[in-house]
Each structure stands twice: as structure tokens, then as C-alpha cells.
Swiss-Prot record:
This is Uncharacterized protein MJ0789. Pfam families: DUF2283.
Length: 116
């Protein structure tokens, strides 16, 4: 499935999702919501207050975001999500990264998840 990226400038929310996929469970890691399908695969990520989390201007997220990658490691108790945003400024690629950790409160299977 194709991954889509949408940014809501007014609310500063970044949404990355697999087009046409249906969410069955959502894991809330404070300002990051991760949606999973019935098989436990990631089908979407919503990042609230995205410009603050990545320390970038909202305009950059609206106009210069060219790629998104997220890799998560899930254990019985914990999920660690490494997120990278790729921005293009003056023909130069800039990578902004953030690592978010939280409790595996919805009983996800151990392993690795990837979106982007």
C-alpha cells in the first residue's frame, strides 16, 4: 500500500498513513498516536505538535517535507519509535530525528514495525 503524508498547518499535526488501510488499535505515546491493523502492522502515525517535536518551522513541514521514515521496536512492555523527517531546503536534504518511548499498553506482539 502507498504511504501518504499530510500536514495540518493550523493544528501542527503530521499524519502518515497507508492509503486504504483500516485501523483496529491505537497506541498513544503522548503526542504520537500509532494505528495498527488487525495483524499488528502499522497503518498510520499521527504526530501532534510536530514542529515542536522536530524543532522545525511549520512552513518546512507544509512545503519542504519530502520523506518520512519510522522504525519501531516492540517488546512485551515497551515500544521505542525512531522517526526521521527528510526536508529539502535550497536543494539540500536535511534530516530531523526524534526517538519516542512508551509502554506497550495494548499488548502488541514483540518485533519491529516500519512505516515510510
Amino acid at each position: 500500500m502507498k504511504v501518504k503524508i499530510d500536514y495540518d498547518y493550523e493544528n501542527d499535526n503530521l499524519l502518515v498513513y497507508k492509503e486504504g488501510a483500516k485501523s483496529k488499535k491505537t497506541l498513544d505515546l503522548d503526542d504520537i498516536l500509532i494505528d495498527f491493523d488487525e495483524n499488528g502492522d502499522v497503518v498510520g502515525i499521527e504526530i501532534l505538535n510536530a514542529s515542536k517535536l522536530f524543532n522545525v518551522d511549520k512552513y518546512d513541514l507544509l512545503k519542504n517535507l519530502i520523506k518520512f521514515e519510522a522504525v519501531g521496536k516492540i517488546t512485551k512492555d515497551l515500544i521505542t519509535l525512531n522517526i526521521k523527517l527528510y526536508l529539502l531546503r535550497r536543494k539540500k536534504e536535511i534530516i530531523k530525528e526524534s526517538v519516542v518511548k512508551g509502554l506497550n499498553t495494548i499488548g502488541l506482539k514483540e518485533g519491529e514495525v516500519v512505516i515510510g
